[in-house]
């Protein structure tokens, strides 16, 4: 099975606090993987390293690869990082859309990496690009809102526009950082259904950070759980039982309660 993401001995320190401890991780083509863990466990930090949004500690053994290309090593981004980012769709918790633009214009932003610079200056997109953008919106059930300003949409609708933008980008990997954290249950279900549909029918590898364990169990075949910057569990979601859940979350809560009491 083809390895899409490879992480070797990744460590990250923020202000003398070790956020990640020598993390090793391999993610294969077509997987949908949930990154779980309490707040501060390092799951979002790990996800940001995968696309090179942040770099790890300056250690020769620290390395991140995506689609066979180096993203970062020894605390430095690869010179051809733009190539890796072009293949990676990143979905943020707060959508990261341009409110003053229409839904269609926001989706077309996904084509900037493959559009000549002079065209981007004037927002001159080809008919074929506009057609692909409409197809992406159809895929996520948002084509009827194509010419509506994105600021008028609900949170769940905006997140689906962000997914359409990743499709427009023709990303081979989608990294989603807490994509349903601020959504109501029905909107969260629709967003997760959309990600699973893209994963299963397009073969796009999806890595998603979640706080909601029930969604991870329902939508992802594999769970990678982090605890205080260490990989605590990496395996089938079917084997992530109550004992593991208790050790991952409740022991952390007890430590926090004891600290407050002290």
Swiss-Prot record:
Protein name: Phosphonates import ATP-binding protein PhnC
Record GO cellular component, one term: plasma membrane
NCBIfam families, alphabetized: ABC_phnC (TIGR02315), PRK09984.1 (NF007438)
Domain of life: Bacteria
Pfam families per the UniProt record, alphabetical: ABC_tran
Lineage start: Bacteria, Pseudomonadati, Pseudomonadota, Gammaproteobacteria, Enterobacterales
Topology in the lipid bilayer: Peripheral membrane protein
Annotated ranges, domain ABC transporter: 5-253
Family that this chain belongs to: Belongs to the ABC transporter superfamily. Phosphonates importer (TC 3.A.1.9.1) family.
Entry keyword set: ATP-binding, Cell inner membrane, Cell membrane, Membrane, Nucleotide-binding, Phosphonate transport, Translocase, Transport
Intrachain disulfide bonds: none
Described function: Part of the ABC transporter complex PhnCDE involved in phosphonates import. Responsible for energy coupling to the transport system.
Molecular-function GO terms, alphabetical: ABC-type phosphonate transporter activity; ATP binding; ATP hydrolysis activity
Gene behind the chain: phnC
Record has Cell membrane as a keyword: yes
Coiled coil ranges: none
Subcellular location: Cell inner membrane
Sequence positions that bind ATP: 37-44
Enzyme class: translocase
Catalytic activity: phosphonate(out) + ATP + H2O = phosphonate(in) + ADP + phosphate + H(+)
């Amino acid at each position: 099975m083809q390895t899409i993401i490879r992480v070797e001995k990744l460590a990250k320190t923020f202000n003398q606090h070790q956020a990640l401890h020598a993390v090793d991780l391999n993610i294969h083509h077509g997987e949908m993987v949930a990154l779980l863990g309490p707040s501060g466990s390092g799951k979002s930090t790990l996800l940001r390293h995968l696309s090179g949004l942040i770099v790890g500690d300056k250690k020769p053994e620290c390395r991140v690869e995506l689609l066979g290309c180096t993203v970062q090593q020894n605390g430095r981004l690869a010179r051809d990082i733009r190539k890796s980012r072009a293949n990676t769709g990143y979905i943020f918790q707060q959508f990261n859309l341009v409110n003053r633009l229409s839904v269609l214009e926001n989706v077309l932003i996904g084509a900037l990496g493959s559009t000549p610079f002079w065209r981007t200056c004037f927002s001159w997109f080809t008919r074929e690009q506009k057609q692909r953008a409409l197809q992406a919106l159809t895929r996520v059930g948002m084509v009827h809102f194509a010419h509506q300003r994105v600021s008028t949409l609900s949170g769940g609708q905006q997140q689906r526009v962000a997914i359409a933008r990743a499709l427009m980008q023709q990303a081979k990997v989608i990294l989603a950082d807490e994509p349903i954290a601020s959504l109501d249950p029905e909107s969260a279900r629709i967003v997760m259904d959309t990600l699973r549909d893209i994963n299963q029918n397009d073969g796009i590898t999806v890595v998603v950070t979640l706080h909601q364990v029930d969604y991870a169990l329902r939508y992802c075949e594999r769970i990678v759980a982090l605890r205080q910057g260490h990989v605590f569990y990496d395996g089938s979601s079917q084997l992530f039982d109550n004992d593991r859940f208790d050790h991952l979350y409740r022991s952390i809560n007890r430590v926090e309660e004891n600290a407050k009491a002290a």
